[in-house]
Amino acid sequence: MSRSRINGNFIDKTFSIVANILLRIIPTTSGEKEAFAYYRDGMSAQSEGNYAEALQNYYEAMRLEIDPYDRSYILYNIGLIHTRNGEHTKALEYYFRALERNPFLPQAFNNMAVICHYRGEQAIRQGDSEIAEAWFDQAAEYWKQALALTPGNYIEAQNWLKITGRFE
């Protein structure tokens, strides 16, 4: 039984129902349908905190999915899991890969900025202000890209950019 069928979460059930209806009415190949089923099950596992299972489903979806746009969201979600697990280098890699396929993912730019900002704060705690500034500058660049895509979002980031003199 697929995860989406055993998940008790209302939103996940609603998503699964709508997704199943769309899969029936939109002309897609069996491979695309199978890829989406793995993606859907990965999202379900991820929402329950079952990250290892989510990753298995996402990797299988990546194996089957051919559309670059759809692949970008799979890669983005893999990045989210690595971020959650504190594997920031891996997370950045997956966000980059997602953006290569879909440069209009402001949430990926935002998450990359958050990681860079965090690393900047770590460098400050370690007494390395030069490295910290480099990380903060990189965070600023990513936040600017996120804001360029969605000007009304990421207010805290926008304020940080203004306060630190990095807003242009």
Swiss-Prot record:
Q: Any keyword NAD?
A: no
Membrane topology summary: Peripheral membrane protein
Q: Per its UniProt record, what InterPro entries does this chain match?
A: PSI_Ycf3_assembly (IPR022818), TPR-like_helical_dom_sf (IPR011990), TPR_rpt (IPR019734), Ycf3/AcsC/BcsC/TPR_MFPF (IPR051685)
Gene Ontology cellular-component terms for this entry are: chloroplast thylakoid membrane
Q: What is its main location?
A: plastid
Intracellular or extracellular location(s): Plastid, Chloroplast thylakoid membrane
Pfam families xrefs:
TPR_1
Per UniProt, the keywords (alphabetical) are:
Chloroplast, Membrane, Photosynthesis, Plastid, Repeat, Thylakoid, TPR repeat
Q: Where are the TPR repeats?
A: 35-68, 72-105, 120-153
User: Matching SMART domains, A to Z?
Assistant: TPR
Q: Tell me, which GO biological process terms does this entry list? A: photosynthesis
Gene3D superfamilies cross-referenced by the UniProt entry = Tetratricopeptide repeat domain
**Could you tell me the superkingdom of the organism this chain comes from?**
Eukaryota
Matches recorded under PROSITE patterns: TPR, TPR_REGION
What's the family? Belongs to the Ycf3 family.
The entry's function note states: Essential for the assembly of the photosystem I (PSI) complex. May act as a chaperone-like factor to guide the assembly of the PSI subunits.
HAMAP family given in the database record: Ycf3
The protein here is known as: Photosystem I assembly protein Ycf3
